[in-house]
């Protein structure tokens, strides 16, 4: 039974596509083709500085590493755009702690 659940998690994560809406300042993932979506919100707080503020995954989809995909996309955006970032969101703080890549760490403002 546990093995089936593990396969299900992997199947879901391989089908995820993160969309970046720069106008609305959010990363999102549509979940199973439904209207449900997971989001990561950010704001510019300076010309080259963003505040990664909030990550939300609908309760029915939690525990499937969906937020991890959003956090990675957001941190990759920070790197690609050569930005600095405040990590207000606790989940992104956790993600960076678990994935302490130098290109992420050098862009975090404390």
From Swiss-Prot:
<feature type="domain" description="N-acetyltransferase">
    <location>
        <begin position="19"/>
        <end position="109"/>
    </location>
</feature>
<dbReference type="Pfam" id="PF14542">
    <property type="entry name" value="Acetyltransf_CG"/>
</dbReference>
<dbReference type="InterPro" id="IPR045057">
    <property type="entry name" value="Gcn5-rel_NAT"/>
</dbReference>
<dbReference type="InterPro" id="IPR016181">
    <property type="entry name" value="Acyl_CoA_acyltransferase"/>
</dbReference>
<protein>
    <recommendedName>
        <fullName>Protein NATD1</fullName>
    </recommendedName>
</protein>
<dbReference type="InterPro" id="IPR031165">
    <property type="entry name" value="GNAT_YJDJ"/>
</dbReference>
<comment type="similarity">
    <text>Belongs to the NATD1 family.</text>
</comment>
